[in-house]
């Protein structure tokens, strides 16, 4: 796929970027170079490579799901939290209706 100056101008317009003729010509060459490199990546044989989502394993430490008993930082403080809200209804924050 080749990028021409009309495509560069359309992309710049969509991104709300003002570019000059010289900048459009420079971007045309840069974008074509990038797309050529991506095409080269597509030619690499990766049939024997196992897919991965990260370079290092992402493992999370698990902890017990318990409520903290500290009265200042612990859970079960709904009424204290809602006391600071401008509006509360049925134990939830009250917000204005935005969809008719």
UniProtKB/Swiss-Prot annotation:
It catalyses: L-glutamyl-tRNA(Gln) + L-glutamine + ATP + H2O = L-glutaminyl-tRNA(Gln) + L-glutamate + ADP + phosphate + H(+); L-aspartyl-tRNA(Asn) + L-glutamine + ATP + H2O = L-asparaginyl-tRNA(Asn) + L-glutamate + ADP + phosphate + 2 H(+). GO terms for molecular function: asparaginyl-tRNA synthase (glutamine-hydrolyzing) activity; ATP binding; glutaminyl-tRNA synthase (glutamine-hydrolyzing) activity. HAMAP family: GatC. Its EC number is 6.3.5.-. Allows the formation of correctly charged Asn-tRNA(Asn) or Gln-tRNA(Gln) through the transamidation of misacylated Asp-tRNA(Asn) or Glu-tRNA(Gln) in organisms which lack either or both of asparaginyl-tRNA or glutaminyl-tRNA synthetases. The reaction takes place in the presence of glutamine and ATP through an activated phospho-Asp-tRNA(Asn) or phospho-Glu-tRNA(Gln). Keywords: ATP-binding, Ligase, Nucleotide-binding, Protein biosynthesis. InterPro entries: Asp/Glu-ADT_sf_sub_c (IPR036113), GatC (IPR003837). This is Aspartyl/glutamyl-tRNA(Asn/Gln) amidotransferase subunit C. The gene is gatC. Belongs to the GatC family. It is an enzyme of class 6 (ligase). The keyword ATP-binding applies. GO terms for biological process: glutaminyl-tRNAGln biosynthesis via transamidation; regulation of translational fidelity; translation. Pfam families: GatC. Heterotrimer of A, B and C subunits. PANTHER family: GLUTAMYL-TRNA(GLN) AMIDOTRANSFERASE SUBUNIT C, MITOCHONDRIAL.
